[in-house]
Swiss-Prot record:
The gene is rplL. Keywords: Ribonucleoprotein, Ribosomal protein. Belongs to the bacterial ribosomal protein bL12 family. This is Large ribosomal subunit protein bL12. The keyword Ribonucleoprotein applies. Forms part of the ribosomal stalk which helps the ribosome interact with GTP-bound translation factors. Is thus essential for accurate translation. Homodimer. Part of the ribosomal stalk of the 50S ribosomal subunit. Forms a multimeric L10(L12)X complex, where L10 forms an elongated spine to which 2 to 4 L12 dimers bind in a sequential fashion. Binds GTP-bound translation factors. HAMAP family: Ribosomal_bL12. GO terms for molecular function: mRNA binding; structural constituent of ribosome. SUPFAM superfamilies: ClpS-like, Ribosomal protein L7/12, oligomerisation (N-terminal) domain. Pfam families: Ribosomal_L12, Ribosomal_L12_N. One of its GO terms (cellular component) is cytosolic large ribosomal subunit. GO terms for biological process: translation.
Amino acid sequence: MSAATDQILDQLKSLSLLEAAELVKQIEEAFGVSAAAPVGVAVAAPAAAAAAEPVEEQTEFDVILESVPADKKIAVLKIVREITGLGLKEAKDLVEAAPKAVKEAIAKDAAEDAKKRIEEAGGKVTIK
């Protein structure tokens, strides 16, 4: 910054609150401007933020095992064990407790892959 602007800034820093308010009034009168924030800007900002929220794309998905036909239970159980890394008993409990989340908060590609594998084994799956 130049020496002149540095000097003005130092002088502004040394003003009391009353002197600063008086300076603002003088600047408003001299230049025909207003220091007040426009009301329309304050109201428009939250509306713009609200409009931007629905545009966000979901990044985490849950794979939900909805149902498993009795004759496909073993095949689905094997796939669930591969996907989750659960032991035999835990995977069996999960499959029998359908509808139940198999994987939660995973990427879209991983969720679609898990859904495809479980459906190929005979289970009914949804992604949320």
